[in-house]
């Protein structure tokens, strides 16, 4: 993780402000700190909400401070995802192959390059990895946590709804003979709907 962190930091230019999509996330996070929670028609607000927590501690008129904060958070989340990927690997492989899996994830060039842009991908990936980690447990109760994280993925990116679909398919294929199969899945679905309902209600109010 530390070596991968070094690569990520090496690829980032902290001397220039964010622009393009990461600019939108930064401006939205600043708006959230000022009480504006309006949504984009094509972009989730989970990442900007997460960033706004940290922006609340910044009192600066220099936009570069906000730019570098969102970059640092993105890098931090991406780095934290590496040991999570190892834990997912351990559900299927021994320690050696799990380490290989996490290393491939840690040093994938595209992921390292994008992690320093301040985009939503690292947090989205972490939510997906966490969701798969819990669904790979043999106890059906963990589907509740898995679907909760699927709801978080939807907050981060609208296409995160596909995480819910994939988790559902995996759940019924791998745990179909388990006791309390439908009860725990039903609880997970209720929690998933509770998590995403604020997004759905707000989007319906804003965009119809």
Model-derived features: where do they sit?
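Membrane-lumen/periplasm interface segments of specific transmembrane helices
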Residues: 7-8, 183-208
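Transmembrane helix irregularities
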Residues: 14, 76, 92-93, 107, ...
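Transmembrane-helix motifs of polytopic, lipid-linked glycan transferases
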Residues: 72-92, 130
